[in-house]
Each structure stands twice: as structure tokens, then as C-alpha cells.
Amino acid sequence: MSIGKEVAMARKRKGITQEQLSLEIPVSRESLAKYETEKRRIPKDLRKCITEGIDDPQLFFKMWSEAAGHVSIPFFNGEYIDLHPTSMRYMVQHETNEALKQLDALSWFKPSQAWSEHEKESMKKAMHEILDATGSMMSLIAVLCDQYGFSMTDIFKYWKVSLRARKYTDG
């Protein structure tokens, strides 16, 4: 689905009109309508303010994918996903346990240049399990934001400040 249609869906999920959104961001209602109906492409420099103006968790995933392509985490909403918070919590636990099991099976004592092709394939498998766990966790955060009315922007702002305070990041 196009990013314009994703913006329209996100705006509707949040109960925001085009007029209301246009008052929050530097875009006219008419331009928003053209972006949403694909008569115009959303300029890259407006994507951040539109996404933050709507503050819809699923839209953040779509914009991330649009900006980074293959190196992004998708929102887990497929046919086999139950988006109830309790179900998502169990999925996180399952995927995390799978990732830890794969990590435990690796030969951590060997330098990477000494690894066989089979061991490297095992590392790739572990990395895919880590991505599954990460995706399930990110999707749980999105579901919890929706369910409890939290701003995903505010959750991430607070988290990033806490990372800097704990010296996990440098900026």
C-alpha cells in the first residue's frame, strides 16, 4: 500500500481530520488530501512531521520501512498474529526464548575468522531469531500504545533520554 494511503488510514485510526492535522503541521488540508489520494508524493522532509503529528504506532513502522527499506522492523499484523496485549506478550516470550536458545548454541569462544561455514550459518539463524524477538517486542509496544492511549513518540523520547542517562548511547 502507498505511503499516502497509510497516512490516511493512520489518521482515521486516530480520529483526526485532514483539517485538524493541517493545523498541527506545515501542510495545507488540500495538500494532505493530494498526498492521501496519491495525486502527489509526500515530500521526504514532511514525513517526520506528518508521522509525529498523527502519532500512530503502525504509521511509524511504515515510515521506517519507507525510509530504510529492507533494514527496518515490520509491524506484526499477519494472519497468524493475535494483537491482544496478552497474546503479544506470550509471543514476545516465545520469540525471545527461541533467540536465546540459538545464541546459547553458538561457539562464542572461537574468534570469528576461525568459524566454519556451518557455524556462520548458525550465527545467521541466531540473528534471524533475534530479529523475530525484536519485531515481536516492537509490535507489543505499538499494541500497548494503542490499547492504553500512550503516545509512541513520548514513549521513545523518554526511553532515549534514559539510554543516554545510563550511558548506553552517546547522543
Please annotate each region the language model reported.
Residues 32, 62, 67-69:
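N-terminal "mature-chain" segments and other terminal, solvent-exposed stretches
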Residues 67-135:
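Helix-turn-helix/homeodomain-like alpha-helical modules used for DNA recognition
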